Curated annotation (Swiss-Prot):
Any one annotated GO CC term: cytosol
Protein localization: Cytoplasm
SUPFAM superfamilies: Triosephosphate isomerase (TIM)
Name of the protein this chain belongs to: Triosephosphate isomerase
UniProt pathway annotation: Carbohydrate biosynthesis; gluconeogenesis; Carbohydrate degradation; glycolysis; D-glyceraldehyde 3-phosphate from glycerone phosphate: step 1/1
Organism: Oceanobacillus iheyensis (strain DSM 14371 / CIP 107618 / JCM 11309 / KCTC 3954 / HTE831)
Lineage of origin: Bacteria, Bacillati, Bacillota, Bacilli, Bacillales
InterPro entries: Aldolase_TIM (IPR013785), TIM_sf (IPR035990), TrioseP_Isoase_bac/euk (IPR022896), Triosephosphate_isomerase (IPR000652), Triosephosphate_isomerase_AS (IPR020861)
Family: Belongs to the triosephosphate isomerase family.
Subunit: Homodimer.
Length: 252
């Protein structure tokens, strides 16, 4: 039985005081136990404070991106070594906004995924198709290729620990949501692709999230699907009560 993983991706939102208030609201009320994992994916300047506030709780703190090198002349970048030193446990990689706005490629996402494992960080690897690709019936090919390239060169054990987030680009921040059946169909395909490049046993262990306009009103239906093990949530994760409702849904 795979546990549910609910990750809130704040993107470029909040200031430090607001981030602290959020954690003050969430940490004491977050469900305890092994049924669900709550992860807050925050901007770099907040990570140290949030890790401190989450100490002693089961709330995890993630970065939204990182460089693949440990150090060097990469002005403006943050390394996996820095994140690990802060106490961060997870890192979001290859989000569609990074791919589209910052030209991140499958090859780059793979380098970052390997770097995450080299420093004992759990990668949340994002994959997903655009509206044009979906309408051209390219969804499975596009997403399958993104998955294959992201996990290329990883050990089976590392693949089993990778969290894959399926985020159809056309459903992010648009208010449009893939139906639970559409979402599950792609998540099932992702598991099949993982099985092809590793084994059925490994594929059964991989946690696959859905992301794209997830909110308390639709999360139950999404999490009830056979191959959806959690959610990567944007806007609805910015409010502590909304985020707690989403996490609570993972315990059902």
């Amino acid at each position: 039985m795979r546990k549910k993983v609910i990750a809130g991706n704040w993107k470029m939102n909040k200031v430090l005081s607001e981030a602290g208030e959020f954690m003050n609201s969430v940490v004491p009320k977050a469900p305890k136990g092994n049924d669900v994992e709550a992860i807050v994916c925050a901007p770099f300047p907040f990570l140290s404070k949030l890790v401190e506030q989450a100490k002693g709780s089961e709330v995890k703190v993630a970065a939204q991106n990182m460089h693949f090198e440990d150090s060097g002349a990469f002005t403006g970048e943050v390394s996996p070594v820095m994140l690990k030193d802060l106490g961060v446990t997870h890192v979001v990689l290859g989000h569609s906004e990074r791919r589209e706005l910052f030209a991140e490629t499958n090859e780059l996402v793979n380098k970052k995924t390997k770097a995450a494992f080299a420093h004992d960080l759990t990668p949340i690897v994002c994959v997903g198709e655009t509206l044009d690709q979906r309408e051209a019936n390219e969804t499975m090919n596009i997403v399958g290729e993104q998955v294959k390239q992201a996990v290329a060169g990883l050990t089976n054990e590392q693949v089993a620990e990778t969290i894959i987030a399926y985020e159809p680009v056309w459903a992010i921040g648009t208010g449009k949501t893939a139906t639970s059946e559409q979402a599950n169909e792609v998540c099932t395909e992702i598991r099949k692709v993982v099985a092809e490049v590793t084994s059925a046993d490994v594929a059964e262990k991989v946690i696959i999230q859905y992301g794209g306009s997830v909110k308390p009103a639709n999360v139950d239906e999404l999490l009830a699907q056979s191959d959806i093990d959690g959610a990567l949530v944007g806007g609805a994760s910015l409010d502590p009560e909304s985020f707690l409702q989403l996490v609570e849904a993972g315990t059902k």
